[in-house]
Regions:
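Hydrophobic beta-strand positions that form the internal "hydrophobic ladder"
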Residues: 174, 218, 259-262, 303-307, ...
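Short loop/turn segments that connect beta-strands within beta-propeller blades
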Residues: 131, 190-194, 234-238, 278-282, ...
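Blade-level signature of beta-propeller repeat domains, shared across WD40, Kelch, NHL, RCC1
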Residues: 401-442
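A flexible loop/linker signature enriched in serine peptidases of the S9 family
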Residues: 167, 178-185, 201-204, 221-230, ...
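Short beta-strand->alpha-helix linker/helix-N-cap micro-motif
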Residues: 39-102, 107-108, 114
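Amphipathic beta-strand/beta-sheet edge segments enriched in Tyr/Trp
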Residues: 96-158
Length: 442
């Protein structure tokens, strides 16, 4: 099952209440699977990448292994960007002469030096257009022993933004659910799988993390009081507090782009419906009114539309509606089971999990419902896709190596990288870039 779907189903069975059992049987029943006309794109050629010549970083003065350590972080960031093919070269002693035959090639040099004052060290990074010999980026970053990784992430993102006009994702984080035994907790890690740390410590079931646009808060569902309630976790303070504890389901949170509203699923009226709850928790607006299940809401980048999953056609399908709940219409017309939609930050694509012959795979399609392309295949269940902030990557959970873990891939399905390994991990949610974060909470 889809990770939002499967995890919710298992959790609802534990809750063992009438409304939860109704929800589970309605949306997670196993019916016949229809044939589809979804294009399989997994064999397609990946987007063309630009050559990047990454020089060995120099060290000046007593800086120890920092140059090699920093370069290793930068190299991984450049590779994971999906933009560059990285080649290792030796550093230059002088500015290189222009070489028009190498149009599109970029050379990156770096030097670590002792710092002064509060900064123990300085990193001087340069990016050069090999064809013209012009310096595209020349910047110095102060750092200390504990901030080398984030300094390299910032440098790589600066290079990406300078060369492509689109900031990279190296400074972002991913929230997810990790299961150990019967306990499910919320965890957070760097985008590359490093610095994994546990967020909740409730010894219960925590599911469906969602990032606030300002990047220091998570919404999630927890069963720690018996009912599936929505809580908010302040990552700065390290504390959680209840947001929606209405009777029945309080699940599948998703923040509006301005942070003023949280879309979610509530069953307080006896049926699972999509609601908008104001960030101050004072106002709740019901958007759907059906005798079926509506769940998994996700906002468009403009905040004017909401995509969601509904089984109103007889099986789970992706629908879209205006933020007021009007103009509800079907998006997916291929396949008998489509769930967990996510709108790309650029707004032109969506991704979701689709079941074919009992197996879940990730589909990417145009936001208007056309051109569905299957980007995973022959690798276990692949579920809960979520876009990176630059729309170039998708993070997802997969059972391709046995138990579910978090993986990352390019938006065309290429360059798959495993990010987690301990426990069983699913429900990934990609956080905002620092420069995208809202300065003021909604």
């Amino acid at each position: 099952m889809g990770s939002n779907s499967a995890s919710r189903a298992r959790a609802l069975l534990v809750a063992a209440t009438t409304v939860l059992a109704l929800f589970s049987s309605a949306i997670f029943s196993s019916g016949p699977v229809a044939q589809t006309d979804v294009t399989t794109g997994i064999k397609a050629t990946s987007t063309m990448k630009s050559p990047l010549l990454l020089a060995r970083f120099r060290g000046e003065g007593p800086v120890g292994a920092l140059p090699s350590q920093g370069r290793a972080v930068a190299r991984k960031d450049f590779e994971l960007s999906g933009v560059f093919n990285v080649a290792d070269v030796e550093p230059l002693d002088a500015k290189p002469a222009p070489d028009p035959s190498l149009a599109g090639n970029v050379r990156v040099e770096g030097t670590v030096q002792p710092g002064d004052g509060a900064a123990f060290f300085r990193f001087h990074g340069v990016a050069i257009d090999v064809a013209t010999g012009e310096v595209a980026l020349d910047r110095t970053y102060p750092f200390n022993d504990g901030t080398l990784r984030e300094t390299m992430h910032r440098f790589v993102d600066d290079v990406l933004e300078t060369l492509t006009g689109e900031r990279g994702i190296a400074e972002t984080k991913i929230a997810y659910v990790r299961q150990d035994g019967r306990v499910k907790e919320i965890w957070v890690m760097d985008y590359d799988g490093e610095n994994q740390r546990q967020v909740t410590h409730d010894r219960s079931l925590a599911l469906s993390p969602a990032w606030a646009p300002w990047g220091s808060e998570l919404a999630f569902t927890t069963f720690k009081r018996g009912n599936p309630d929505l809580y908010l976790f302040d990552l700065t303070r390290g504390a959680s507090y209840p947001f929606s504890t209405r009777p029945g389901l309080n699940t599948a949170p998703n923040y509006s782009p301005d942070g003023k509203w949280i879309a979610c699923t509530l069953s307080r009226d006896g049926n699972a419906e999509i609601y908008l709850i104001s960030r101050d928790a004072q106002t709740a607006k019901r958007l759907t009114r059906n005798t079926v299940i509506d769940t998994s809401p996700t906002f468009s980048p403009t905040g004017r539309e909401i995509m969601f999953t509904s089984n109103r056609t007889g099986s789970p399908q992706v629908f879209v509606m205006d933020v007021e709940g009007l103009n509800q219409r079907l998006v997916t017309i291929e396949g008998s089971y489509n769930d967990s939609p996510q709108w790309s930050p650029k707004g032109d694509k969506i991704c979701y999990a689709a079941r074919h012959d009992g197996i879940f795979d990730v589909i990417v399609m145009d936001a208007n419902g056309s051109n569905p392309i299957q980007i995973t295949a022959n690798a276990g269940h692949n579920e809960n896709p979520h876009w990176s902030p630059d729309s170039r990557k998708i993070v997802f959970s997969s059972s391709r190596e046995g138990k579910r873990q978090i993986f990352m891939m390019n938006a065309d399905g290429s360059d798959v990288v495993r990010l987690t390994g301990d426990g069983e991990c699913f429900n990934p949610a990609w956080g905002p870039r620092p420069k995208d974060k809202l300065a003021v909470k909604g």
